């Protein structure tokens, strides 16, 4: 794997990364079961913080190529892609519950993943199997390395044949601490 990035003090950072490798069990007990099959990923990421408003924008988009056996049906995608953009806006910075540098943020995540890029060989129609999401949220950071977050996730999931999407929504609560 490898990553390269360019950073500008005002504009932010743009990076490109790649990773990959063999993912299947191609031998067992000295017997060759299959050839080595690879999965390879290329991703572009971006992050910046507005010096005027403190707004943070972070995003990533990835392309994936999977070596799927030709005998598998088209429901096993050989190409995938997806990404997200997170926008985080601090709305309150002050002492809260004894934490001197607490921050309350409004957040929004927009995301898309297509698990099977392409068209059906027989009909030429687009293969579905993709998810779109909009996730507004509220996060509290009592200290820089800890976050308590409440989101409402709005999701549209398309099946393989791109029938009308399953529409789901729900609250998510999370706590994370990085050290």
Q: Where do the protein language model's features map onto the residues?
A:
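Surface-exposed beta-loop-beta
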Residues: 1-77
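Membrane-embedded beta-strand positions in outer-membrane beta-barrel channels/transporters
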Residues: 1-3, 43-45, 84-86, 135, ...
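Short loop/turn motifs that connect adjacent beta-strands in outer-membrane beta-barrel proteins
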Residues: 9-14, 51-54, 92-104, 145
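Outer membrane beta-barrel transmembrane domains
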Residues: 25-27, 74, 88-141, 149
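Outer-membrane beta-barrel "beta-signal"
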Residues: 87, 166-179
């Amino acid at each position: 794997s490898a990553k390269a990035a360019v950073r500008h003090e005002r504009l932010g950072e743009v990076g490109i990364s790649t990773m990959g490798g063999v993912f299947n069990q191609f031998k067992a007990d000295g017997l060759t079961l299959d050839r080595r099959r690879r999965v390879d990923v290329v991703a572009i990421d971006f992050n910046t913080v507005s010096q005027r408003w403190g707004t943070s924008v972070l995003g990533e988009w990835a392309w994936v190529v999977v070596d799927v056996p030709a005998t598998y049906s088209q429901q096993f995608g050989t190409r995938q892609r997806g990404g997200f953009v997170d926008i985080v806006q601090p709305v309150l910075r002050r002492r809260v519950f004894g934490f001197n540098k607490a921050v309350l943020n409004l957040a929004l995540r927009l995301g898309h993943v297509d698990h099977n890029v392409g068209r059906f060989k027989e009909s030429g129609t687009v293969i579905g199997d993709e998810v779109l999401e909009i996730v507004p949220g509220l996060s509290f950071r009592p200290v820089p390395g800890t976050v308590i977050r409440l989101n409402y996730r709005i999701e549209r999931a398309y099946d393989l044949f791109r029938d009308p999407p399953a529409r789901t929504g729900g609250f998510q609560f999370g706590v994370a601490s990085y050290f």
